[in-house]
């Protein structure tokens, strides 16, 4: 008797090729349900609908299709237990040798803006997880596949083992099945419970050479079943990404996501920007960002919000860089970058979308917070000094504020001409960060803008900035001594704007 395969998938990637090989090369019979059966039929493949096999029609608008003893009996039967085989024979149930199933796209659904509870609930799969768990449990006697990435390996197993997948492969596939259902149920529980329950699930994408330091083991995990963010990036050249590369790439992505309307470039070292700039072209933006701190840019991570062209590629090859990421990279640019073969060059079409929540572990638990993604243009800024801003000053203040948001606290950023001139990051007091940023800016601080991620507890930052030639300041406000800083700004002829929003970053 021909072997029997049950196929019921939401993600139909690779389905037809797999099914054709099963039928033509290994003489499987196919049973399937719903849209999967229709896809197989449309491809000209012989398939029996589950409803015809079980004798029970799909009901409740498709909510009940595979929940039937002829399905689950065929999956769960132990081929080495005589009573199980007798039960199959008495109930006219064929043993199922292969189950190919993946689940309704629940996580993709709840990620959509404005999705309703009713829409989310309809994407909670019932029959799929039941089949996935049952077939994973019975891996001693059948194979379960829940990811299109497994299909080719499974076919190779059949070819190398006289048409039967090895026990080692079946057990590995079963583990993947249980991990898949565990992640799926966790996503549902987290969604329905709101803040009461938070579960973080991931599948190891690759082992990393090490973590932040060589003595720290590390790995890269993918959340969800569909590649998004960095798991969807395409590496065009270069060595494997390291833990630190990925951390810095994400820091770069967060900055570049602030700027969509104008070509923008940022260069990151240890998660802080050493240069960020806007310009009319992407090559000009990169040149400005690089020249903002050419010393620190050596060995940096570059993110661009426009495709890499030949001119930009030529500039990128003039110094040592760890990684470059952009939405795309044309063929001529790739040829130029290939001369620096060790540079990791990635393309990621969507550099704007990041995680909505951030997780940090502490002893005995973990902390969860919403991402700091409040849009700068939705904040009601307040001009608190006698001097009022020009349109160009407002644009510069906004640029400085957006960059400062992504600098480790205490953070001070000095900018001019939509380019960072000095970045003071991570100091234990604000005046210390101010002095670092102003020292980097040097004479270019005259007439420039200063942004702070937190309020000024004293007027010393204002006075230090004025002494260096700063013309305008943007900061959250909220100090009991705000008036001291406002008074100093008026006294010294500075413009000051309060945003009312703090951007600490630890």
Swiss-Prot record:
SMART domains: AICARFT_IMPCHas (SM00798), MGS (SM00851). One of its GO terms (cellular component) is cytosol. Disulfide bonds: none annotated. InterPro entries: AICAR_Tfase_dup_dom_sf, Cytidine_deaminase-like, MGS-like_dom, MGS-like_dom_sf, PurH-like. Pathway: Purine metabolism; IMP biosynthesis via de novo pathway; 5-formamido-1-(5-phospho-D-ribosyl)imidazole-4-carboxamide from 5-amino-1-(5-phospho-D-ribosyl)imidazole-4-carboxamide (10-formyl THF route): step 1/1; Purine metabolism; IMP biosynthesis via de novo pathway; IMP from 5-formamido-1-(5-phospho-D-ribosyl)imidazole-4-carboxamide: step 1/1. Keywords: Hydrolase, Multifunctional enzyme, Purine biosynthesis, Transferase. GO terms for molecular function: IMP cyclohydrolase activity; phosphoribosylaminoimidazolecarboxamide formyltransferase activity. Residues 1-146 form the MGS-like domain. It catalyses: (6R)-10-formyltetrahydrofolate + 5-amino-1-(5-phospho-beta-D-ribosyl)imidazole-4-carboxamide = 5-formamido-1-(5-phospho-D-ribosyl)imidazole-4-carboxamide + (6S)-5,6,7,8-tetrahydrofolate; IMP + H2O = 5-formamido-1-(5-phospho-D-ribosyl)imidazole-4-carboxamide. GO terms for biological process: 'de novo' IMP biosynthetic process. SUPFAM superfamilies: Cytidine deaminase-like (SSF53927), Methylglyoxal synthase-like (SSF52335). Its EC number is 2.1.2.3, 3.5.4.10. The IMP cyclohydrolase activity resides in the N-terminal region. Belongs to the PurH family. This is Bifunctional purine biosynthesis protein PurH. It comes from Trichormus variabilis (strain ATCC 29413 / PCC 7937).
